[in-house]
């Protein structure tokens, strides 16, 4: 037990704790998130393997959480979130370890840590686990606009939106995009 942290593995019973950490992390990052009902359906309806939730707690409080999806011997850390003020306690390390341990318990031979930009701090973190990069290629048949100039302002704006309003926007955007 590192810094008094404990990892708990489960399914639907951990959904509220997972979503609390996920949504707060998304807000800290200044990004849009998926609505809670998306994860409810994922946890309850995933039929291609296992869908497991892992929650890391400090003194009973959820401070890190992740979703593990398995399919045909492969496991993917599909969503991963920690509360920033607890990061000095190495929450992400315990969370990854617990997700990997669960993938191994389920008989998976491959574990994916999710996407990251080459050279980014997240990518460097993942390289500590002796990972092998698998490049992703994106193709488009139309000219793409570079939103990078708007992104810093949008991030700051999203951080200011109250959580209940952000959840409504997330649900609306999810319906339009997916």
What do these predicted regions represent?
Residues 44-48, 103, 129, 151-153:
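Alpha-helix boundary/capping detector
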Residues 1-88:
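A conserved beta-strand-loop-helix scaffold within acyl/acetyltransferase catalytic domains
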Residues 18-21, 82, 104-105, 148-149, ...:
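Generic signal for short, ordered secondary-structure residues
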Residues 26-34, 58-62, 99, 161-168, ...:
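Short, charge-rich amphipathic segments
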Residues 41-43, 87-88, 100-101, 145-147, ...:
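Short, intrinsically disordered/low-complexity patches at protein termini
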Residues 72-135:
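Acyl-donor binding region in acyl/amide transferases
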Residues 108-178:
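Active-site/acyl-donor-binding loops of N-acyltransferases
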Residues 13, 70-73, 96, 100, ...:
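Membrane-targeting and insertion segments and their boundary/processing signals
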């Amino acid at each position: 037990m590192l810094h008094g942290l404990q990892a708990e593995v489960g399914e639907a019973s951990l959904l509220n704790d997972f979503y609390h950490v996920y949504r707060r992390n998304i807000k800290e990052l200044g990004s849009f998130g998926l609505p809670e009902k998306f994860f409810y359906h994922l946890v309850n309806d995933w039929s291609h393997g296992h869908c497991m939730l892992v929650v890391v707690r400090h003194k009973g409080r959820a401070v890190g959480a992740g979703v593990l999806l398995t399919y045909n011997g492969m496991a993917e850390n599909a969503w991963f979130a920690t509360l920033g003020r607890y990061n000095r306690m190495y929450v992400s390390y315990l969370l990854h370890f617990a997700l990997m341990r669960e993938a191994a318990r389920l008989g998976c031979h491959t574990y994916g840590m999710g996407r990251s930009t080459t050279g980014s701090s997240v990518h460097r973190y993942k390289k500590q686990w002796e990972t092998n990069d698998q490049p992703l290629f994106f193709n488009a048949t139309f000219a793409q606009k570079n939103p990078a100039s708007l992104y810093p302002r949008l991030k700051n704006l999203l951080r200011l939106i109250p959580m209940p309003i952000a959840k409504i926007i997330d649900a609306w955007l999810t319906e339009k995009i997916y």
